[in-house]
A protein has these predicted regions:
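Extracytoplasmic small-molecule ligand-binding "clamshell" domains
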Residues: 27-105
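Extended ligand-binding regions for polar small-molecule ligands
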Residues: 66-75, 141, 146-147, 154-155, ...
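Ligand-binding clefts/hinges and TM-proximal coupling segments of bilobed small-molecule sensing domains
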Residues: 155-172, 209, 239-268
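N-terminal export signals
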Residues: 5-24
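A ligand-binding cleft/hinge motif common to bilobed small-molecule-binding domains
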Residues: 89-92, 105-114, 159-162, 183-215
Length: 268
C-alpha cells in the first residue's frame, strides 16, 4: 500500500466505524419476532386494482399481491390480516406501525427509497393508456388538451405529467374513481398499470388500450427503513415460491400467462 492509499484509508476509518451503529439504530427490534409474538402479520393492500388486489364475488379479499403476502405469513408461521390502503395512505400507515409491510402495486423508486425499503422485485409491469374504442387517441402524442385521469400519489401521475405536459390531468384517490370518470365520459383517457387497464377492458366492453408501454414499473413489497428481518422473510418467501413453482402458478392464475421476469434466486 502506498502512502496516498494509507492516508485515504486512515481518513475513512472514523466514518466506517460509525456504520454498524447507524444500521443498528435503523433496524430496532426484530420485527419478525414481534409478528410472531403478536400472532399475525399486518399487511397493507389495495382492493381496487384487479388482479393485484380486489374483493371477490363473496366480498373476500383476493388478488396476486394478497397471495404473495399470504405466502410470507405462512413462511413466518402466522396468519395475515389485511388493511385497505390507497396510494396516498400506504407509506404513512407503514411508517406509523399500523401495518408491518405493504404490497399494493407499488413501484420501487429511488425517491421512495429515501423513506422506506423494498423487497426484491416480485412483478415488472408498465404504464399504458385506456380509451373508448371509438377514440381517435393512439398514444401520448395525442393527449394535448385531452382529459386524462390517473391515480393520485403514484409514479403513473408523474410519468404522464412528464410525457404529456399539455394534457388536462386529474388525479383521483383510487382506480375505481378514475375508471368511473372514464366510463361516464368525464375523461378521455385513463392511464395506469397495463395489467390493471387490461382488467378494466376485459370486464367492460367498449374500451381499448393504446400507446404501448410508457414506462417500466418494478413492483416491490414496501418495508420500514432498516427492517432487514422482514425484508429477508419476504425475499426468502419469493425465492422459495419460484423454486417450488408456486410463484408461476399464482402468476398464471392472475394474469393468464407465464411469468415474463424470473425471481432472482440466490445460492444457499
Amino acid at each position: 500500500m502506498n502512502r496516498r492509499s494509507m492516508m485515504m484509508t486512515a481518513a475513512l476509518l472514523p466514518a466506517l466505524a460509525t456504520i454498524p451503529h447507524a444500521a443498528s439504530a435503523q433496524c430496532g427490534p426484530d420485527s419478525v419476532a414481534q409478528v410472531k409474538a403478536r400472532g399475525k402479520l399486518l399487511a397493507g393492500v389495495k382492493f381496487d386494482t384487479p388482479p393485484f388486489g380486489f374483493l371477490d364475488d363473496n366480498n373476500n379479499p383476493a388478488g396476486f399481491d394478497l397471495d404473495i403476502l399470504r405466502a410470507v405469513a405462512a413462511h413466518i408461521g402466522v396468519p395475515v390480516e389485511f388493511t385497505k390502503v390507497t396510494s396516498v395512505s400506504r407509506v404513512p400507515l407503514l411508517l406509523s406501525g399500523n401495518i408491518d409491510l405493504v404490497a399494493a402495486s407499488m413501484t420501487h423508486t429511488r425517491e421512495r427509497e429515501r423513506t422506506i425499503d423494498f423487497s426484491m422485485t416480485y412483478y415488472t409491469g408498465g404504464q399504458s393508456l385506456l380509451v373508448a374504442k371509438n377514440s381517435p387517441i393512439t398514444g401520448v402524442g395525442d393527449l394535448a388538451g385531452k382529459r386524462v385521469v390517473v391515480q393520485q400519489g403514484t409514479t403513473l401521475e408523474k410519468t404522464i405529467g412528464r410525457l404529456a405536459p399539455d394534457a388536462r390531468v386529474t388525479a383521483f384517490r383510487d382506480y375505481d374513481a378514475a375508471w368511473l370518470a372514464l366510463a361516464q365520459g368525464r375523461a378521455d383517457v385513463l392511464t395506469g398499470s397495463l395489467t390493471i387497464l387490461q382488467g378494466f377492458a376485459k370486464n367492460n366492453g367498449g374500451f381499448k388500450i393504446v400507446g404501448g408501454l410508457l414506462s417500466s414499473e418494478p413492483f416491490g413489497v414496501g418495508l420500514r427503513k432498516g427492517d432487514w428481518a422482514m425484508r429477508d422473510a419476504v425475499n426468502e418467501t419469493l425465492q422459495d415460491m419460484w423454486t417450488a413453482g408456486a410463484y408461476a402458478k399464482l402468476y398464471e392464475g392472475a394474469f393468464g400467462s407465464p411469468p415474463t421476469t424470473p425471481i432472482e434466486v440466490w445460492p444457499a
